[in-house]
Curated annotation (Swiss-Prot):
Sequence repeats lie at residues 270-282, 287-299, 306-318, 325-337, 340-350, 359-369, 373-383, 387-397. The keyword Disulfide bond applies. Residues 268-401 are annotated as: P domain (Extended arm). Keywords: Calcium, Chaperone, Cytoplasm, Cytoplasmic vesicle, Developmental protein, Disulfide bond, Endoplasmic reticulum, Glycoprotein, Lectin, Membrane, Metal-binding, Repeat, Signal, Stress response, Transmembrane, Transmembrane helix. Induction: By stress conditions, such as higher temperature, EGTA, DTT or tunicamycin (at protein level). Disruption phenotype: Reduced fertility and slowed development. Temperature-sensitive reproduction defects. Disulfide bonds join C152-C186, C352-C358. This is Calnexin. Residues 270-337, 340-397 are annotated as: 4 X approximate repeats. The keyword Endoplasmic reticulum applies. The lineage of its organism: Eukaryota, Metazoa, Ecdysozoa, Nematoda, Chromadorea. An alpha-D-glucoside binds at Y156, K158, Y177, D184, E417. It is found in: Endoplasmic reticulum membrane; Cytoplasm, Perinuclear region; Cytoplasmic vesicle. Ca(2+) binds at D109, D428.
């Protein structure tokens, strides 16, 4: 019990400490808001510093959109049309520009911006050097900002296969790509695509393989209007990892964590194998020899009127069960030409309240004991049943044992091809390389600086997220955090409630016996009345002891000193005799306890103190 109490005290201490820390956070937030409102300074954007890679770095592509960048130089806008769609939406007529975001946090930091919504957009750029999937790790990284949020649309990159760089002006949805990577959202939740297009070396077909990923990523990346960093790393072993803002989102291996499986089955069903004409797959058939019984009447209804039923004695057939509401009034805007004749709504008839019913009484219906329904022949086992037919298995002529990078075509260009219902989507710092160190270095020089400045801008304009909002945003990315919050808040509260309001242990009475030996107070009557009743009983004792038939009090006659001395001596001798008699009746621990009744017969009766003992147990 002591350990439990200490545990509850410790939990309460942790909870109070957390609340105090939260209060400190909120106080700091309030101070910042107050300071911002009273002493608000104009936000001054920091100056953009161009990222620099080491001299040893040789990225395949890197564009941070420096000042002076224009559409048509590095990035070529598509002039193609989508196939198999209406002509009015077939064109890639979405507008692009290179510029600053609507809210500038870093002066001179530009990006590639989607300027229109509800249109098809396509734009592409040629890599400085092609990326061949051999022994090098593949890394693609970029940051994206949905300034207006995202209702429905993408924000992903397509790493175009070799040959696409020759005609970027005709880049479209059917242009071959090797990897597609990036965010996509339509509705309340989104996903971060990772799709590989892998070539079968046996038959030359190229198929899409989707990486397995979380089903509930949330909507924070699209709806918080902040910049987010997306990074993909694919290693020659087939291992891949997807991270957002430097934190792992999901990971796996091309050989085992894609859908469909990259390795084809060794055996397949023979498509030329056809089911024989006489193959019977019916396990049970109707018994043709069965005959409907003569007493089977299909015309009998399922229920019939209960002829034994009688009308209840309090059934009132003169009253209707429902009547027009007498308090209802026709609406003032009621037009009988348009709405028809107005009728008051029906309500329960108050005259029928408490009765079995009103209106015309009808006998209830019961199940018809003669009902059998439609007769059907029973089922019997099919003697010609051969089982479920399946085509025979043959060796898969297109089977191969894949190697992670063997079926990935070289990448020569990067493109953005998407439909979106939102505008002002900004792409920036697009990097394709074989060096994870380069991607980390670029992120430190670009994204993390931008993230810090965006937070500073939000705080200066009063748009920063509070403590609770950050908690909720975290659950969008990781819904399982709700369980953690409940465990951290609800369980301590329950523990504190049990500790504070749980069942209390009963106090040990101060008159409890410490041994089984008989004691002189075993025959005393327990306290059965409260203090107020004790006072009343005490007063009654005083009244009984008062002399005089009338109950009036008179002053006692004075006694001389000799009489007082004799009285005191007599009282002393009586007290000594009583104590000796009590000692005689005390049972030693090694002797059996005498019955209470026997002891009571031998004990002297004290009639004057009976009421007093009844009033208080311990006296």
């Amino acid at each position: 019990m002591v350990n439990r109490k200490w545990m509850y005290i410790f939990i309460q201490f942790l909870l109070v400490s957390s609340i105090r820390s939260d209060d400190d956070v909120f106080e700091d937030d309030e101070e910042e808001v107050t300071k911002g409102s009273d002493d608000k300074e104009e936000f001054v954007p920091s100056l953009f510093v161009a990222p620099k890679l080491s001299d040893k770095s040789t990225p395949n592509f890197f564009d941070y959109f420096p000042v002076g960048s224009k559409i048509g130089l590095t990035w070529i806008k598509s002039l193609a049309k989508k196939d198999d769609v209406d002509s009015d939406i077939a064109k890639y007529n979405g507008e692009w520009s290179i510029g600053a975001p609507t809210k500038v946090s870093i002066e001179g930091d530009l990006g590639l911006i989607v300027k229109t919504k509800a249109r098809h957009h396509a734009i592409a750029a040629k890599l400085n050097t092609p990326f061949a999937f051999d022994a090098n790790t593949f890394v693609v990284q970029y940051d994206i900002k949905f300034e207006e949020g995202q209702e429905c649309g993408g924000g992903y990159l397509k790493l175009l296969s070799e040959g696409a760089e020759k005609d970027l002006a005709n880049f479209q949805d059917k242009t071959a790509y090797t990897i597609m990577f990036g965010p996509d959202k339509c509705g309340a939740t989104g996903k971060v695509h990772l799709i590989f297009r892998y070539k079968n070396p046996i038959n030359g077909t190229i198929s899409e393989y989707h990486a397995n990923q979380p089903t509930t990523i949330g909507s924070t990346y699209w709806d918080d209007h902040n910049t987010h960093l997306f990074t993909l790393v694919v290693k020659p072993t087939g291992e891949y990892s997807v991270s957002v803002d430097g934190k792992s989102l999901y990971y796996g291996n091309m050989m085992s964590d894609v859908t469909p499986a990259l390795t084809p089955p060794k055996q397949i069903f023979d498509e030329t194998d056809l089911k024989p004409v006489d193959w019977d797959e019916r396990e049970n058939i109707e018994d043709e020899s069965a005959v409907k019984p003569d007493d089977w009447d299909e015309n009998e209804p399922q229920s019939v009127v209960d002829e034994a039923a009688t009308k209840p004695y309090d059934w009132n057939e003169e009253e209707n069960e429902l009547i027009a509401d007498p308090e209802a009034k026709k609406p003032q805007d009621w037009d009988e030409d348009m709405d028809g004749s107005w009728e008051a709504p029906l309500i329960d008839n108050p005259a029928c309240k408490g009765l079995s019913g009103c209106g015309t009484w009808k006998a209830p219906t019961i199940k018809n004991p003669k009902y059998k329904g439609k007769w059907i022949r029973p089922k019997i086992s099919n003697p010609a049943f051969k089982g479920k037919w399946t085509a025979r298995l043959i060796d898969n002529p297109n089977y191969f044992e894949p190697k992670p990078f063997a079926g990935l075509a070289p990448i020569t260009a990067v493109g953005i091809e998407m439909w979106t219902m939102s505008e002002n989507i900004l792409f920036d710092n697009i990097l394709i390389t074989s060096s994870e160190e380069d991607s980390s270095d670029v992120a430190k020089q670009t994204f993390y600086v931008k993230q810090k400045e965006e937070y500073r801008l939000a705080a200066a304009t009063g748009n920063g997220n509070g403590f609770f909002q950050q908690i909720i945003d975290a659950t969008n990315e990781k819904p399982w955090l709700w369980a953690v919050y409940i465990l951290c808040v609800l369980l301590p509260l329950v523990a504190i409630g049990v500790f504070c309001f749980g069942k209390q242990s009963k106090p040990t009475p101060n008159f409890a016996k410490k041994s089984d030996a008989y004691s002189a107070d075993d025959d005393r009557v327990p306290n059965l009345v409260d203090d107020d009743e004790e006072e009343i009983i005490g007063d009654e004792e005083d009244d009984v002891n008062q002399p005089g038939p009338s109950g009036s009090q008179s002053n006692p006659e004075p006694q001389d000193e000799e009489e007082n001395a004799e009285q005191q001596s007599a009282n002393s001798s009586q007290s000594s005799a009583a104590e000796e008699e009590d000692d005689e009746h005390v049972v030693p621990e090694n002797e059996p306890v005498k019955p209470t009744e026997e002891f009571a017969k031998k004990s002297p009766k004290n009639t004057g103190g009976a009421k007093r003992r009844t009033a208080r147990r311990g006296d």
